[in-house]
């Protein structure tokens, strides 16, 4: 549903408001590119960007991953891989209504108000076109909420929307991160 063009204005606004360097990743999308193509693109991009930090005027000690919806899952996966030293270190993550559980078993999935674009049916459609099997559905890289060890992650900010079918996933991820002793800031917006 989103791409570089749809998120350009938000990225520019964040850049202006925070005086930070914002780099948006144009990762491969399904159905043309199935799991784990988006993860591979994201990880390759993070590694390349951090390795060229001086060129991009980036302080390597202030790199934060951010994403919304499926991009929130990619940011979460990148943060976990950073902790495991599979990619360069990141220092925080911002997850905006993250889609972190491809099993789609949370109660908020049943939120289906008239006129909403995102509902369980559309989410199932996206998942069916992204994943090849149940094994991929429960793979921690597709469902970071199911990661066995979520300890020692950098500070996390999670934003949820009360009428979003993904709201319970963000809340569940918050609770799991807290149970592992991580610093988590959570804000739920009405609507």
Where are these regions (language model features)?
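Alpha/beta-hydrolase superfamily serine-hydrolase fold, recognizing
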Residues: 1-191
């Amino acid at each position: 549903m989103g791409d570089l063009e749809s998120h350009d204005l938000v990225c520019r606004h964040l850049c202006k408001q925070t005086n930070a360097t914002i780099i948006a990743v144009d990762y491969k999308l399904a159905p043309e590119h199935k799991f784990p193509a988006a993860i591979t693109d994201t990880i390759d991009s993070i590694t390349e960007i951090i390795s060229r930090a001086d060129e991009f005027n980036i302080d390597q000690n202030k790199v934060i991953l951010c994403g919304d919806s499926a991009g929130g899952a990619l940011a979460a996966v990148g943060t976990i891989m950073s902790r495991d030293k599979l990619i360069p270190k990141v220092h925080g993550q911002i997850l905006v209504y993250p889609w972190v559980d491809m099993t789609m078993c949370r109660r908020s999935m049943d939120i289906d108000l008239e006129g909403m674009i995102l509902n369980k049916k559309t989410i199932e459609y996206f998942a069916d076109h992204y994943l090849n099997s149940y094994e991929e559905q429960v793979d921690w890289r597709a469902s970071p909420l199911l990661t066995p060890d979520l300890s020692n992650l950098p500070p996390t900010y999670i934003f949820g929307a009360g009428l979003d079918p993904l709201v319970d996933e963000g809340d569940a991820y918050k609770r799991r991160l807290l149970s592992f002793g991580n610093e988590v800031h959570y804000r739920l917006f009405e609507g």
